[in-house]
């Protein structure tokens, strides 16, 4: 098997196997070929990982942020040196085209290690509060053992986005990747260990929906950070609340992308395509409700159709390929069902809508699909599809489109394309979402916070804001004189 790791889990600085766990087969989405066979964590493996993290964390927390940061920056350097191999593994794991993974996956993970390794001494500062002759100060302290639960669309990136702020803040982490993409996180653990991270501080265990509750409900876990669907987020948040654990939830979305009639049309079309077809549409922040002002709708659709039908679908390891397969057969079938629902409910099919015939029949391929004349009540306009399906809706004026854009339970992202920057800022101020773009879409550098509102979650990934979610404030009052007591 072309991507078989040394063992299923990485615990306390070494690979660990336990064949008593349920078998997890890793399939290459382009062909359906089994590329690795692993085992889900048993309760004993979960205990072993959490015990290793708990044992290692106090000594790590006692190190200076600068010393911790040096290790993270070394890990970033190693990732960049091995970017090609890591990108190919990510493509095998996810089916995403190599032309994407080589610029967007391990590289963004390395950016996270470099960023947090460099800024933590400033980001973890406390404050001094003068109180007359007395004074107080605050300091940021780590939470302890953190659990990270990853999704299958950006497995290496997500592992790094969670590990970097957790580790630099002085925590230890047990990370569970998605069972669909189990391979990349093991390499991240290997690289961190090679960079000098002490044993037990970043552990990776495999698992499925039965493994998550063992982690979330464990009494030694202080924080849970999940990237996943809204239903999963609700279950995890409810379980974590039972023990008052800290939580970060980066969940799904049905985000609006608004194109006004004064926008640069080619840029707007490009933004809509990036916001719907990148990673074969498997991006939580995608702007899948594309609102186009009526006066430019015909020309917008004409250019969109031409560019969509020109996209190259094929082998993800071919650098010319622009669209790869879905991550799994089940996900493809889910997306196909949504496409059929769009047709049945009266949306106009502009492009795609079927299975491409120029690729392996065993792969999980689907054509990038555009629907027009979509109304707000259609299923494809209300529910997260998580595939390459764009819904184009038309609108008349600003107030109307803002009201319709906000009429969703989700609030992860949104975008505005317009030449009028006053209007752009006015609109984003009124949109109910955590992450917004003006004349751009789906750019998420590690320097800026990323996260949602409403049913799309809470807490923030990346930037200095992430440190607030992996640490807590300790307040110290210092009395400088005798205590005055009334008794």
UniProtKB/Swiss-Prot annotation:
It is an enzyme of class 1 (oxidoreductase). Its EC number is 1.2.1.8. Keywords: Metal-binding, NAD, NADP, Oxidation, Oxidoreductase, Potassium. Binds 2 potassium ions per subunit. InterPro entries: Ald_DH/histidinol_DH, Ald_DH_C, Ald_DH_CS_CYS, Ald_DH_CS_GLU, Ald_DH_N, Aldehyde_DH_dom, BADH. Involved in the biosynthesis of the osmoprotectant glycine betaine. Catalyzes the irreversible oxidation of betaine aldehyde to the corresponding acid. Dimer of dimers. This is Betaine aldehyde dehydrogenase. It comes from Rhizobium leguminosarum bv. trifolii (strain WSM2304). The gene is betB.
């Amino acid at each position: 098997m072309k991507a078989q790791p040394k063992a299923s889990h990485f615990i306390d600085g070494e690979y660990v196997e336990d064949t008593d766990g349920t078998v997890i087969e890793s399939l290459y989405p382009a062909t359906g070929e089994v590329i690795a066979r692993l085992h889900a964590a048993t309760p004993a493996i979960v205990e072993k990982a959490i015990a290793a993290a708990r044992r290692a964390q106090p000594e790590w927390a006692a190190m200076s942020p600068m010393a911790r940061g040096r290790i993270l920056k070394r890990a970033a350097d190693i990732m960049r040196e091995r970017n090609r191999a890591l990108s190919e593994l990510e493509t095998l794991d996810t089916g995403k085209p190599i032309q994407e993974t080589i610029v967007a996956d391990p590289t963004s993970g390395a950016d996270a290690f470099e960023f947090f390794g460099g800024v933590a001494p400033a980001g973890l500062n406390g404050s001094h509060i003068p109180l007359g002759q007395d004074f107080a100060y605050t300091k940021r302290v780590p939470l302890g053992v953190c659990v990270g639960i990853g999704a299958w669309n950006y497995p290496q990136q997500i592992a790094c986005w969670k590990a970097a702020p957790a580790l630099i803040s002085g925590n230890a982490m047990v990370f569970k990747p998605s069972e669909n993409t189990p391979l990349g996180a093991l390499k991240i653990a290997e690289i961190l260990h090679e960079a000098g991270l002490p044993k037990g501080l970043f552990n990776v265990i495999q698992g499925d929906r039965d493994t998550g509750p063992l982690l979330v409900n464990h009494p030694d876990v202080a924080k849970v950070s999940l990237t996943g669907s809204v239903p999963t987020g609700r279950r995890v948040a409810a379980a974590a609340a039972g023990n008052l654990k800290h939580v970060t939830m980066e969940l799904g979305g049905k985000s609006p992308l608004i194109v006004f009639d004064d926008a640069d049309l080619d840029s707007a079309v490009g933004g809509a395509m990036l916001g719907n077809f990148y990673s074969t549409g498997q991006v939580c922040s995608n702007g899948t409700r594309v609102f186009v002002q009526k006066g430019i709708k015909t020309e917008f659709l004409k250019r969109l159709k031409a560019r969509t039908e020109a996209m190259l679908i094929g082998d993800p390891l071919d650098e010319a390929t622009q669209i790869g397969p879905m991550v799994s057969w089940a996900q493809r079938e889910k997306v196909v069902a949504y496409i059929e629902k769009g047709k049945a409910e009266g949306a106009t099919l502009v492009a795609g809508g079927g299975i491409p015939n120029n690729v392996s029949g065993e792969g999980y391929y689907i054509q990038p699909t555009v629907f027009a004349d979509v109304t707000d009540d259609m299923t494809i306009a209300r529910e997260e599809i998580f595939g390459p399906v764009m819904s184009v809706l038309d609108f008349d004026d600003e107030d109307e489109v803002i009201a319709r854009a906000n009429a969703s339970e989700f609030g992860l992202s949104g975008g505005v394309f317009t030449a009028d920057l006053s209007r752009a800022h006015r609109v984003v101020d009124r949109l109910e979402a955590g992450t917004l773009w003006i004349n751009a879409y789906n750019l998420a550098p590690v320097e800026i916070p990323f996260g949602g509102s409403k049913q799309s979650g809470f807490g923030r990934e990346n930037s200095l804001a992430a440190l607030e979610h992996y640490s807590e404030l300790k307040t110290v009052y210092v009395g400088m004189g005798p205590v005055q007591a009334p008794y």
